[in-house]
């Protein structure tokens, strides 16, 4: 299928890790967490003779491999909030929720605060220090969306944009929603 063509490198990575799990009895996921795979340890992964139960364990371990990297979002949120609490903006930026790959924060309606958050949050979202996710061309990234006047309208701020660009974008959106 198209999915498997598009993600063949990722698919191969998972298959290689599952083959290793059949030798080790566990698969190592994000941040070194080990997920035990006792059934895989009893089979030769990748052969045509893997029992259904071991195949199911392989699917679960494969899902854990990919889904565990959702912890990168948590790592970014913790690192960002540490910076917030050490900054003059500790009362201006509040964490609200983490959902999969999104960090929801409430930011005071102040250009300096928004600019600071746009720089520091994106810096933490770009973090790529785990050896298994380091790559010369594929980089992690993110963008800060401002929702105004409500959750149905998102304005994406360009990364590393100067304050003037942020102000211009936000002013434009405000004028669109306050037209008579």
Regions found by a protein language model. Name each.
Residues 1-180:
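Conserved catalytic core of nucleotide polymerization and phosphodiester-bond processing enzymes
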């Amino acid at each position: 299928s198209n999915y498997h063509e598009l993600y063949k490198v990722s698919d191969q990575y998972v298959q290689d890790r599952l083959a290793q799990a059949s030798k080790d009895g566990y698969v190592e996921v994000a941040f070194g967490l080990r997920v035990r795979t006792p059934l895989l340890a009893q089979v030769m992964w990748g052969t045509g003779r893997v029992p259904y139960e071991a195949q199911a364990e392989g699917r679960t371990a494969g899902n854990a491999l990919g889904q565990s990297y959702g912890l990168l979002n948590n790592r970014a949120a913790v690192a960002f909030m540490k910076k917030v609490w050490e900054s003059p903006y500790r009362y201006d930026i509040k964490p609200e929720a983490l959902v999969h790959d999104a960090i929801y924060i409430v930011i005071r309606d102040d250009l300096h605060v928004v600019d600071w958050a746009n720089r520091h949050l994106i810096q933490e979202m770009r973090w790529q220090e785990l050896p298994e996710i380091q790559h010369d061309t594929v980089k992690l990234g993110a963008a800060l969306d401002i929702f105004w006047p409500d959750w149905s309208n998102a304005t994406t701020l360009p990364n590393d944009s100067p304050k003037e660009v942020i102000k211009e974008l936000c002013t434009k959106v405000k004028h669109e929603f306050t037209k008579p």
